[in-house]
Amino acid sequence: MPEKKRVAIIGCGRMGQHYAGAYDMFEDTEIVAIAEYNDARRKVVGERFGVTALYKDANELFKDIVPDLAAVILPGKYIKEAVIAAAEAGVKGVSSDKPIAATLHDADEMVNICEARGVIFHGGNLQRASHEIQETANRLRQGWYGKILGATLHAWGSSEISGGGCQELAVLRLLTSAEVTEVISWAGPQDALESDSDEGLFVHALFRMSNGLECPVSAHSIGFGGLDIWTENTLIRCKGPKVEMFQGFDGDGKRTQVDPRFSDFPWPRFNYLGSSIRSLISAVDHGSEMAISGHDLRQSLEIAIAAKYSALWGSVPVKLPLADRSLTLYPHTYRWLGGDQSGNPQTVEEARSRSLQN
């Protein structure tokens, strides 16, 4: 059996513990170090996963250990420093999580430093890594369903266009094999629009895509939220990580739902966290395309910022890529500062016994 990948977990809050649980279960990975600022949680999570190399932060960890992989699962404010520390330490691959940053310049810096050092920069636990979405994307590329004629997005981000909405944006770009090149938007309420955060901001928009498609975007649900893509006789509906398929029409002209017959997923316990991690390992080992990359998270941030500023400036069409890389959009406080700093701290008892769930 090949030598196990040595993994460092940077940040062991609730989501970091999910990552640790997955890496602990895979046969070809082992957790060799943990960095966690909370002293009590660091101790109990180390005990839970049998890890004795415990550190306060990423910089302290990398002075002693250079693992193969580093999983950065920190509140948004602290992601950049840890990702860059991992790249400069010489890891083979580093994963982040959502949202990658608040400012485009910070996202650019992470992407550029990893690229310059030959470090795989993976995106983390995002729905785009779902095996159903990845299999659908492969089928679309192979022409199974014909030419894409349209796309639409409902309930974008559920009032968090960056912190939550990065999910749908990454899937939209994947399934259409296209980039968003122009955004025009309408948003409210006004106080949310004028703030520096996406918290409570509802956005309606029109995205122009590099392949000629126009994608209408609604802030609200119409009984479901998610992404619809259609061809001449097929409608593909993405609801989070799950995909529904409609092909052909009945006698009344109504679409007929069919079984997409996706292949079996080898790690159902881990859902798209599992497929995301396997994608990172494959990229490190074989140079294969990542299911979700740091670049993808940067693109999602850029689209969200463009939508916010288009509305703020009076529904002005905004071209992408944005020239001003200092533009900023903070996520909700709990995403930016973490649960401990936003009124939802994790107890030691929960950290000691928390079961793995996605």
Where are these regions (language model features)?
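Glycine- and charged-residue-rich phosphate/anionic-cofactor binding loop of Rossmann-like
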Residues: 30-33, 283-298
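Beta-loop-alpha module in the N-terminal Rossmann-like domain of NAD(P)-dependent dehydrogenases
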Residues: 19, 49-114
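Aromatic/hydrophobic pocket-lining residues that form π-stacking "cages" and hydrophobic walls in ligand
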Residues: 42, 82, 110, 136, ...
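N-terminal Rossmann-like dinucleotide-binding module
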Residues: 1-49
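NAD(P)-dinucleotide binding in Rossmann-like oxidoreductases
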Residues: 193-198, 210-276, 293, 307, ...
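Rossmann-like dinucleotide-binding domain that binds NAD(P)(H)
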Residues: 149-224, 228, 295
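A contiguous, mid-protein "functional segment" used to position or interact
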Residues: 74, 290-332
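A contiguous active-site-proximal alpha/beta segment in oxidoreductase catalytic domains
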Residues: 69, 95, 100-160
